[in-house]
Curated annotation (Swiss-Prot):
UniProt-annotated site: Cleavage, residues: 10-11, 152-153
Miscellaneous notes: Cleavage after Gly-152 by AvrRpt2 is critical for the release of RIN4 from the membrane and its subsequent proteasome-dependent elimination.
Compositional bias annotation for Basic and acidic residues: 62-87
Pfam families (alphabetical): AvrRpt-cleavage
Organism in which the protein naturally occurs: Arabidopsis thaliana
InterPro entries: RIN4/NOI4, TypeIII_avirulence_cleave
Function field: Essential regulator of plant defense, which plays a central role in resistance in case of infection by a pathogen. It is a common target for both type III avirulence proteins from P.syringae (AvrB, AvrRpm1 and AvrRpt2) and for the plant Resistance (R) proteins RPM1 and RPS2. In strains carrying the appropriate R gene for avirulence proteins of the pathogen, its association with avirulence proteins triggers a defense system including the hypersensitive response, which limits the spread of disease.
Protein name: RPM1-interacting protein 4
Covalently lipidated residues, kind S-palmitoyl cysteine: 203-205
């Protein structure tokens, strides 16, 4: 069944001799029973059709629960990173403190070794090696003995470390020469006393022969 085309309402000035009443009557007769008249040119007739339009697709906005979950996870990750950074900083500070303590103990040990008279290669703090002590003679006091340094014990890269070696060698030579004189004078009475038994024996022999 052909449906009559309802002319646009209010457009009668553009067209002449348009039988609007005939159009409306014909449209009323041809419409199905129980159906509702719809005019696409009139928004009032289309109010029901707009209400029956398919719903819009759901928006892509996240739910509040999801937002809270994401925020809590981010806060947890941030707090975890801060705690790890804090632990790393504490560990670095403790390691630095331990390293400083080790360096302090090492410097104390070095200073003790440098000042210790029993240390093999002890230094006087000026870069010069101390001369090594030698065995003292019984007839000499420790104050009068000049210790002979080991030959070549100075630092070849530091020429100033050999300063005073010539003076030490000359002094040692003088002390040894004076010590030889003292020891020679002390041996003289012993040599004379060793001759006394020969003299007495010769006298006895002469006396015995005279008799």
């Amino acid at each position: 069944m052909a449906r009559s085309n309802v002319p646009k309402f209010g457009n009668w000035e553009a067209e002449e001799n348009v039988p609007y009443t005939a159009y409306f009557d014909k449209a009323r007769k041809t419409r199905a029973p129980g159906s509702k008249i719809m005019n696409p040119n009139d928004p009032e007739y289309n109010s029901d059709s707009q209400s029956q339009a398919p719903p819009h697709p759901p928006s892509s906005r996240t739910k509040p629960e999801q937002v809270d979950t994401v925020r809590r996870s981010r806060e947890h990750m941030r707090s975890r990173e801060e705690s790890e950074l804090k632990q790393f900083g504490d560990a670095g500070g403790s390691s630095n403190e331990a390293a400083n303590k080790r360096q302090g103990r090492a410097s104390q040990n070095n200073s003790y070794d440098n000042k210790s008279p029993l240390h093999k290669n002890s230094y006087d703090g000026t870069g010069k090696s101390r001369p090594k002590p030698t065995n003292l003679r019984a007839d000499e006091s420790p104050e009068k003995v000049t210790v002979v340094p080991k030959f070549g014990d100075w630092d070849e890269n530091n020429p100033s470390s050999a300063d005073g070696y010539t003076h030490i060698f000359n002094k040692v030579r003088e002390e040894r020469s004076s010590g030889a004189n003292v020891s020679g004078s002390s041996r003289t009475p012993t040599h004379q006393s060793s001759r006394n038994p020969n003299n007495t024996s010769s006298c006895c022999c002469f006396g015995f022969g005279g008799k």
